[in-house]
Amino acid sequence: MTDLAPIKIVRLDKELPLPKRAHRGDAGVDLHATTDAVIAPGHREIVGTGIAIALPLGTVGLVHPRSGLAAREGLSIVNAPGTIDADYRGEIKVCLINLDPEKPIMITRGDRIAQLVIQKVELVDFEEVEELDDTVRGDQGYGSTGKTA
């Protein structure tokens, strides 16, 4: 055992390794593909990871693309980051997309396809009001930073 917080995990596919960090200080752990897949240019595919986890209340799992695959192959995640809520108990699946305009991407069972990052999250309730407090920024949104009136 380590001094890191334990997360309960069920390995749904016993032939795949448990998620692990490449280095102790890494934020994410690698997730592996349960099946082979060929993703055509511009297409997407939902790929299982063979694991289910039980996150504590007040945490969230975020599924991120792997930077090397994104840079080399154009492989990304459609809804990056994917969100795993604390009360979800099913298999973690990843909706991969091939952003390369020309070549298909081959996924082989066992390939590392994504990273899972566990973070604390602030759980809140919303209170409806008639108006919000004034701020210097106000309602200046998209593209407004650094511009003067």
Curated annotation (Swiss-Prot):
Keyword Repressor: no
GO biological-process terms attached to the record: dUMP biosynthetic process; dUTP catabolic process
Keywords associated with the record: Hydrolase, Magnesium, Metal-binding, Nucleotide metabolism
EC number of this enzyme: 3.6.1.23
Catalytic activity, reaction form: dUTP + H2O = dUMP + diphosphate + H(+)
GO molecular function, one term: dUTP diphosphatase activity
Cofactor field: Mg(2+)
Pathway info: Pyrimidine metabolism; dUMP biosynthesis; dUMP from dCTP (dUTP route): step 2/2
Presence of keyword Hydrolase: yes
InterPro entries: dUTPase, dUTPase-like, dUTPase-like_sf, dUTPase_trimeric
Binding-site residues, substrate: R66, S67, G68, N79, T83, I84, D85, K93
NCBIfam families in the cross-refs: dut (TIGR00576), PRK00601.1 (NF001862)
Role of this protein: This enzyme is involved in nucleotide metabolism: it produces dUMP, the immediate precursor of thymidine nucleotides and it decreases the intracellular concentration of dUTP so that uracil cannot be incorporated into DNA.
Matching PANTHER family: DEOXYURIDINE 5'-TRIPHOSPHATE NUCLEOTIDOHYDROLASE (PTHR11241:SF0)
Family stated for the protein in its record: Belongs to the dUTPase family.
Protein name: Deoxyuridine 5'-triphosphate nucleotidohydrolase
Organism this protein belongs to: Corynebacterium glutamicum (strain R)
